[in-house]
Swiss-Prot record:
Gene3D superfamilies: Phosphatidylinositol 3-kinase Catalytic Subunit, Chain A, domain 1
Keywords of this entry: Cytoplasm, Isopeptide bond, Nucleus, Ubl conjugation, Ubl conjugation pathway
Propeptide: 84-90
Keyword Ubl conjugation listed: yes
Assembly mode: Interacts with uba5. Interacts with ufc1.
Entry protein name: Ubiquitin-fold modifier 1
Length: 90
């Protein structure tokens, strides 16, 4: 079985630490997200993986599909940082 390798960078840390993960192509991407979140001590339930261009990745696919669509360099961010806008005051 072939493997795919991802370089996942933690964007919420100014030092931009990264992890390199190699997983079988058929691995559910939710498992990759969960493992990367645990490695960076970010809660998996509140983390999101995006491309270097800022495009969010739907984790409901295989690691092989993500690799083919988005390449190997990805970023993990806490979801409280997703969006870019601020909440208007009421």
């Amino acid at each position: 079985m072939s493997k795919v390798t991802f370089k996942i960078t933690l964007t919420s840390d100014p030092r931009l630490p990264y992890k390199v993960l190699s997983v079988p192509e058929s691995t559910p991407f939710t498992a990759v997200l969960k493992f990367a979140a645990e490695e960076f001590k970010v809660p998996a339930a509140t983390g999101a993986i995006i491309t270097n261009d800022g495009i969010g990745i739907n984790p409901a696919q295989t690691a092989g599909n993500v690799f083919l669509k988005h390449g190997s360099e990805l970023r993990i961010i806490p979801r409280d940082r997703v969006g870019g806008g601020h909440q208007p005051r009421m």
